[in-house]
Amino acid sequence: MSTSAADTLSRPSVRPAGRAVDALRPFSLERGFTRYAEGSVLVRAGNTHVLCTASVLEKVPPFLKGRGEGWVTAEYGMLPRATHTRGDREAARGKQSGRTQEIQRLIGRSLRAVFDLRLLGERTLHLDCDVLQADGGTRCASITGAWVAAADAVALLMQRGDLAHNPIRDAVAAVSVGLVDGRAVLDLDYQEDSACAADVNVVMTGSGAFVEVQGTGEGATFTRGELDTMLGLAEGGIAQLVRAQREALQ
């Protein structure tokens, strides 16, 4: 049964942390967290903490050589004890998991959506997103933090005179939404994510355009009305995240 946004927001909260259904977890962006990267940000979304660094490489992948444009790409990983039990480093296993590959491709796609790669010149902006502590929403936090790290790296390039124009056309941020106990909720933590009937990750630009929507039923189905309600919550949450990004850069 579909639920209107108004009905969803008017009922009392049933969330473990007592949050309203449209409330983000406490969110912060700490810039300049590491010394050497051209851009670095520690993003905290509740108990999810991700270190995002942006490195400038004066080269491009072979398929872009001689074309006069740059590239933005990403890698993603989790520290062995980012979760309740220790996991082996993927380097020790000798291969990345399918999940890791999917997430880092998502981060790269999301950042490229708001870059004019021609203005970047023949260089690569390489984003590394390392999860220090995971409590749900790590890919969304990575995208939101990586954009700020990228903005700092671009600002440094412009300050050095390496770029004449800013290649970043817009902000980009991401948030999760889902159906928990029959209700649409924003910014799921691990407890909610483990129990949800539907899980949707939404990536949007600062101007309100969708970059990507990843949605799945978790042993259940959801209606078009429920999807619309979840997307409405995501739009509101991402607007708040974009404001936080812009405030962090001031």
Swiss-Prot record:
SUPFAM superfamilies: Ribonuclease PH domain 2-like, Ribosomal protein S5 domain 2-like. One of its GO terms (biological process) is rRNA catabolic process. Pfam families: RNase_PH (PF01138), RNase_PH_C (PF03725). Phosphate binds at residues 99, 137-139. PROSITE patterns: RIBONUCLEASE_PH. It catalyses: tRNA(n+1) + phosphate = tRNA(n) + a ribonucleoside 5'-diphosphate. Keywords: Nucleotidyltransferase, RNA-binding, rRNA processing, Transferase, tRNA processing, tRNA-binding. The keyword Nuclease does not apply. Its EC number is 2.7.7.56. GO terms for molecular function: 3'-5'-RNA exonuclease activity; tRNA binding; tRNA nucleotidyltransferase activity. Phosphorolytic 3'-5' exoribonuclease that plays an important role in tRNA 3'-end maturation. Removes nucleotide residues following the 3'-CCA terminus of tRNAs; can also add nucleotides to the ends of RNA molecules by using nucleoside diphosphates as substrates, but this may not be physiologically important. Probably plays a role in initiation of 16S rRNA degradation (leading to ribosome degradation) during starvation. Homohexameric ring arranged as a trimer of dimers. HAMAP family: RNase_PH. Belongs to the RNase PH family. This is Ribonuclease PH. It comes from Bordetella parapertussis (strain 12822 / ATCC BAA-587 / NCTC 13253).
